[in-house]
């Protein structure tokens, strides 16, 4: 009886024509406004950096790195997804009709579900590309310098869009199916009837794990860079002029600071996506016979949508001064802990060299 009740409730949600009484567009309106505003602010900040980079001399033109190119593509993807998805929901609330009834042959429902799966996958692929770029930059610098270029980053976006388009078009080819969910303001992959939803969720999980693995590798390499720079302080400081060891050490410190800033930004975006994807992942792996609540399904979708709202605000808030503050807080204890050890090591080496001279 319980399974039959769940099946009938699911079928009612899939074919419902009118929204239930009391449904409010307030949350959807706030999410749409926050998403558009945040992405526009982030794009404006990135555009200013692009203009500043164009105005720089050739020797300083590396200030806009490949990482910032990928961030620009991520923000553009989030803005495009917000502008193409949210208006459909607002139109449904305005007409008090479900997505199935909003257009003939459930076209609005199919469009919404396809766009939702497409932009969610594209966002995760962009985060993976950013994490892979950091991994190659830190872990394999020679390969990175020879094979990876800033102009090559411009090709990442169309490649990601092509992959996402092919994967998300499978339900249109009868592998999987897009259906409407309660209260009728959103559509997604049919739950439990095919393996496509589990395949989609598994792909997102694999991408999240890959991003976390790349970030962990970057953290280990940054720790090694910190230890090397700490040991180099014990060496002679001769040739502090241009091109000397002093200049090299300053360049290493600047490079490490920039990499740490990029890692902080990428780590926060990755954690955000992982947290926002968790309810959807639980929703995807739940059994069809379990008692799923309408509100839980809707909250899972909203959590997945929130990621495209948070990402640009993270970039807009974490400006270089804020990143420097966070870096100083994160590194303060390590520096204080290692300062005494560094001085002790340096004095020990100095005493040993004096005894050798005697």
UniProtKB/Swiss-Prot annotation:
Organism the protein comes from: Homo sapiens
Region (Disordered): 231-253
SUPFAM superfamilies, sorted: Family A G protein-coupled receptor-like
GO molecular function, a single term: prostaglandin E receptor activity
Pfam families with a match to the protein in the record: 7tm_1
The protein, known as: Prostaglandin E2 receptor EP2 subtype
GO biological process, one term: adenylate cyclase-activating G protein-coupled receptor signaling pathway
Name of the gene: PTGER2
Keyword set includes Electron transport: no
Superkingdom field: Eukaryota
């Amino acid at each position: 009886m319980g399974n039959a009740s769940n099946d009938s409730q699911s079928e009612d949600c899939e074919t419902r024509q009118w929204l239930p009484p009391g449904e409010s567009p307030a949350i959807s309106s706030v999410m749409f406004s926050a998403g558009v505003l945040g992405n526009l602010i982030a794009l404006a900040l990135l555009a200013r950096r692009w203009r500043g980079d164009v105005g720089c001399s050739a020797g300083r033109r590396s200030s806009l790195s490949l990482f910032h190119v990928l961030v620009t593509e991520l923000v553009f993807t989030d803005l495009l997804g917000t502008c193409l998805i949210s208006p459909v929901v607002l139109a449904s609330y305005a007409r008090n009709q479900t997505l199935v009834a909003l257009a003939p042959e459930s076209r609005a429902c199919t469009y919404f579900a396809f766009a939702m799966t497409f932009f969610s996958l594209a966002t995760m692929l962009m985060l993976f590309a950013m994490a892979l770029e950091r991994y190659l930059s830190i872990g394999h610098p020679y390969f990175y310098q020879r094979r990876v270029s800033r102009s090559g980053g411009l090709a990442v976006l169309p490649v990601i869009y092509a992959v996402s388009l092919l994967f998300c078009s499978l339900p249109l080819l009868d592998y999987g199916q897009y259906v409407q969910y309660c209260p009728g303001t959103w559509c997604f992959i049919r739950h439990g009837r095919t393996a496509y939803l589990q395949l989609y969720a598994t792909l997102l999980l694999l991408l999240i794990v890959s991003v976390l693995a790349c970030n962990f590798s970057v953290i280990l390499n940054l720790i090694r860079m910190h230890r090397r720079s700490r040991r180099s302080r014990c060496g002679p400081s001769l040739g502090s002029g241009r091109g000397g060891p002093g200049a090299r050490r300053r360049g290493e410190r600047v490079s490490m600071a920039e990499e740490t800033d990029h890692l902080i930004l990428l780590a926060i975006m990755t954690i955000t996506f992982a947290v926002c994807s968790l309810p959807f992942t639980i929703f995807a792996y739940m059994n069809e016979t379990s008692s799923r609540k309408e509100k839980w399904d809707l909250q899972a979708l909203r959590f997945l949508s929130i990621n495209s709202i948070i990402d640009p605000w993270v970039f807009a808030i974490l400006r270089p001064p804020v990143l420097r503050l966070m870096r100083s807080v994160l590194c303060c204890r390590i520096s204080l802990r290692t300062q005494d050890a560094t001085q002790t090591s340096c004095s020990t080496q100095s005493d040993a060299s004096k005894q050798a001279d005697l």
